[in-house]
From Swiss-Prot:
Belongs to the ABC transporter superfamily. Maltooligosaccharide importer (TC 3.A.1.1.1) family. Transmembrane segments: none annotated. GO terms for cellular component: ATP-binding cassette (ABC) transporter complex, substrate-binding subunit-containing; maltose transport complex. It is a peripheral membrane protein. The keyword Glycoprotein does not apply. It is found in: Cell inner membrane. It catalyses: D-maltose(out) + ATP + H2O = D-maltose(in) + ADP + phosphate + H(+). Part of the ABC transporter complex MalEFGK involved in maltose/maltodextrin import. Responsible for energy coupling to the transport system. Pfam families: ABC_tran (PF00005), TOBE_2 (PF08402). ATP binds at G36, P37, S38, G39, C40, G41, K42, S43. Signal peptide: none annotated. This is Maltose/maltodextrin import ATP-binding protein MalK. Keywords: ATP-binding, Cell inner membrane, Cell membrane, Membrane, Nucleotide-binding, Sugar transport, Translocase, Transport. The gene is malK.
Length: 369
C-alpha cells in the first residue's frame, strides 16, 4: 500500500488547461472517489497518477517517490477501466494471470495469486470459463481480479460500473466496498455518479472544470458544501435554489427576504455579508417541510408528481420566484397535478450562497459530521 500526493499538478494540451493546480493528499489505505460532471478532468487526473498522461507542471508522489518521470509499469499501480478489456479466447484464469505471464512470473506464483484472488472475488468456480460465458458483473470481477493479482500498491478504477445495469451496479458497488475493507488497499475511484461517490468513499474529491471544488467526507459535502456547484451536484434530486436579498445581519445569523416578501433568519456565518446583497438560498428537496409545521412557507401549483413507492417527489411552480421547486417526502403523498400545494422552509436546514457561489458556513450541527 502507499499514499498518493499531488502538488500543484496541472495538465494542459496547448492552450487548453484540463487540470488546474491540483493539490491532494490521499492517505495509505484510503478509498477516495473523484466525482464531477463529464469534462471536469477526473479521468485525466487518474491517468496522470497511472502514468498514462504526462504532467505539464507540478509533482506527483506515490509513497516517498516522485513519479513524474517514472514509467507506468514501475509505479506500482493497477487500473480497471470502464471496458472489461478481456481476451475472448482466454479463460478467466488466463485473463487474470496474463500480466504476470508477460512479466515472467513463475507458474506456481501465478496459480497461487489467481486462486487467492478468485476466492476473494467469488470466481473460483469460473476459472476455466471464457468471457462469453460470464455475466456483466462476473466479467467486471475478472477485470478487477486481473489487477489484484499484480498486487499493486495503489488501485485505480475509472468508471468501472458504467456498463452494468442498475441492479448489477448496486451489487458491484457493495462488492467493491467489501473488497476494500478486506484488502485495505489505497483505492482511487472515478465516477460521475454521486450515489456511487457517497456510498463508497472515505473521502470525496469534487472536481469542477479542472479544479478541486471541495474535498471531504461524504456527509460533510452533503451538509456543508463549500459552494453552490458542490451543493447542486451532491444529492439527488439536486438542491433547490431561490434568489434572496439580505435585509439584516447579527452574530451568527443572516436575515434574508424571499421573492414573496417573507423574511427568514438563517443560522449561518454572517462575517462579510452586507445588507442589500443579492444571494441564493439553497434547500434540499428532502429538507422541505409540510406547510402546517413551518413558519415560512411558499405556495405554488403542482406541475409533476413522481410516485416512487417509498417516496414521492413533487415539482411545484412557485409564481413568486418563477421557477419550480422539488419537494421530496418519504412514503406516498396523494396530490393531483394542477393542485395548489404549500411547502415550508426550516431555517436550520437552509444554505446561503454569495454571488460568487461561495457558501456562508452553516452553523446547525448535523449528525455524522
Amino acid at each position: 500500500m502507499a499514499s498518493v500526493q499531488l502538488r500543484n499538478v496541472t495538465k494542459a494540451w496547448g492552450d487548453v488547461v484540463v487540470s488546474k493546480d491540483i493539490n491532494l493528499d490521499i492517505h495509505d489505505g484510503e478509498f477516495v472517489v473523484f466525482v464531477g460532471p463529464s469534462g471536469c478532468g477526473k479521468s485525466t487526473l487518474l491517468r496522470m497518477i497511472a502514468g498514462l498522461e504526462t504532467i505539464t507542471s507540478g509533482d506527483l508522489f506515490i509513497g516517498e517517490t516522485r513519479m513524474n518521470d517514472i514509467p507506468p509499469v514501475e509505479r506500482g499501480v493497477g487500473m480497471v477501466f470502464q471496458s472489461y478489456a478481456l481476451y475472448p479466447h482466454l479463460s478467466v484464469a488466463e485473463n487474470m494471470s496474463f500480466g504476470l505471464k508477460l512479466a515472467g512470473a513463475k507458474k506456481e506464483v501465478m496459480n497461487q495469486r489467481v486462486n487467492q484472488v478468485a476466492e476473494v472475488l467469488q470466481l473460483a468456480h469460473l476459472l476455466e470459463r471464457k468471457p462469453k460465458a460470464l455475466s456483466g458483473g462476473q466479467r467486471q470481477r475478472v477485470a478487477i481480479g486481473r489487477t489484484l493479482v499484480a498486487e499493486p500498491r495503489v488501485f485505480l478504477l475509472d468508471e468501472p460500473l458504467s456498463n452494468l445495469d442498475a441492479a448489477l451496479r448496486v451489487q458491484m458497488r457493495i462488492e467493491i466496498s467489501r473488497l476494500h475493507k478486506r484488502l485495505g488497499r489505497t483505492m482511487i475511484y472515478v465516477t460521475h455518479d454521486q450515489v456511487e461517490a457517497m456510498t463508497l468513499a472515505d473521502k470525496i474529491v469534487v472536481l469542477d472544470a479542472g479544479r478541486v471544488a471541495q474535498v471531504g467526507k461524504p456527509l460533510e459535502l452533503y451538509h456543508y458544501p463549500a459552494d453552490r456547484f458542490v451543493a447542486g451536484f451532491i444529492g439527488s434530486p439536486k438542491m433547490n435554489f431561490l434568489p434572496v436579498k439580505v435585509t439584516a445581519t447579527a452574530i451568527e445569523q443572516v436575515q434574508v427576504e424571499l421573492p414573496n416578501r417573507q423574511q427568514i433568519w438563517l443560522p449561518v456565518e454572517s462575517r462579510g455579508v452586507q445588507v442589500g446583497a443579492n444571494m441564493s438560498l439553497g434547500i434540499r428537496p428532502e429538507h422541505l417541510l409540510p406547510s402546517d409545521i413551518a413558519d415560512v412557507t411558499l405556495e405554488g401549483e403542482v406541475q409533476v408528481v413522481e410516485q416512487l413507492g417509498h417516496e414521492t417527489q413533487i415539482h411545484i411552480q412557485i409564481p413568486a420566484i418563477r421557477q419550480n421547486l422539488v419537494y421530496r417526502q418519504n412514503d406516498v403523498v396523494l396530490v393531483e397535478e394542477g393542485a395548489t400545494f404549500a411547502i415550508g422552509l426550516p431555517p436550520e436546514r437552509c444554505h446561503l450562497f454569495r454571488e460568487d457561489g461561495s457558501a456562508c458556513r452553516r452553523l446547525h450541527q448535523e449528525p455524522g459530521v
